[in-house]
């Protein structure tokens, strides 16, 4: 065989990867969210099920990325004041690193039900720790207070979704669902951006603007009410 004196692929134009603009954002709609939460409430009262339930509900209530959540220590959560400090993340080899971006460093307010749930979870975790001679520092650790593998938790999530009769999705769907709930409740995009830790407001708007269906539908009624108020004044 003889060597070709030129590269035949030199002038080949490699097609650019298409943007994911048309890709559907995965989140739990109202029906599937209700179905999944009902399923969680009916699980046998084992610590493993309680752990999973608290993890899912914490993600849903805060919009945290899964690796931000798995990096949490109890010292990051002020149960008395109802705040959660996001300042680190857990990488794929279970090492603690800095957050994704500077804007990812944030303090999130917790609702009362989530605070109560975390109090109950901490008490149950502490009881198990006493039996094992451990004091748990990490919120979502394994039995020995070591960081847990997110991939194993993903496998458990898939099993729960199948049993609940819900479509399959990843942990990130909880984040999208959180944003969707806040958006349709009327929270401004800027507040959602800060809560999610997005670097730019445009990022939040690009990702979630099409989820504001309720707000879009309400726009006409807001207009009608404004006109009627103007007429009657």
Predicted features and spans:
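Proline-centered turn/helix-capping motifs that create local helix->coil transitions or kinks
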Residues: 1-8, 78-82, 123-132
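Basic, Lys/Arg- and aromatic-enriched nucleic-acid-binding interface segment
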Residues: 4-6, 10-72, 80, 104-105, ...
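Generic beta-structure capping elements
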Residues: 15-17, 87-89, 113, 143, ...
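Catalytic-site neighborhood detector that most strongly recognizes the C-terminal catalytic loop/helix
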Residues: 27, 90-92, 196-222
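Short, basic (Lys/Arg/His-rich) helix/loop patches that form interaction surfaces
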Residues: 38-49, 62, 108, 125-138, ...
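C-terminal secondary-structure termini that scaffold catalytic or DNA-interacting sites
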Residues: 81, 94, 99-105, 112-114, ...
């Amino acid at each position: 065989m003889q060597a070709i004196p030129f590269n035949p692929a030199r002038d080949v134009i490699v097609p650019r990867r298409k943007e994911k603009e048309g890709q559907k954002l995965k989140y739990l709609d109202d029906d599937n969210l209700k179905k999944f939460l009902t399923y969680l409430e009916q699980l046998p009262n084992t610590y493993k099920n309680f752990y999973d339930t608290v993890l899912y509900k914490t993600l849903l209530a805060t919009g945290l990325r899964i690796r931000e959540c798995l990096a949490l220590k109890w010292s990051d959560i002020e149960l008395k004041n109802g705040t959660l400090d996001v300042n680190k993340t857990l990488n794929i080899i279970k090492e603690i690193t800095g957050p994704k971006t500077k804007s990812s460093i944030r303090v999130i307010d917790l609702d009362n039900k989530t605070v109560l749930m975390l109090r109950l979870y901490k008490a149950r975790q502490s009881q198990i720790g006493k039996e094992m001679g451990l004091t748990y520092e990490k919120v979502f650790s394994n039995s020995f207070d070591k960081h847990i593998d997110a991939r194993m938790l993903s496998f458990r999530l898939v099993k729960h979704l199948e049993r609940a009769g819900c479509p399959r999705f990843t942990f990130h769907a909880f984040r999208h669902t959180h944003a969707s709930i806040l958006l349709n409740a009327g929270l401004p995009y800027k507040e959602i951006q800060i809560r999610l830790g997005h670097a730019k407001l445009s990022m939040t708007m690009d990702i979630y603007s099409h989820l504001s269906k309720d707000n879009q539908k309400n726009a006409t009624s807001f207009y009608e009410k404004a006109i009627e108020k103007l007429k009657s004044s």
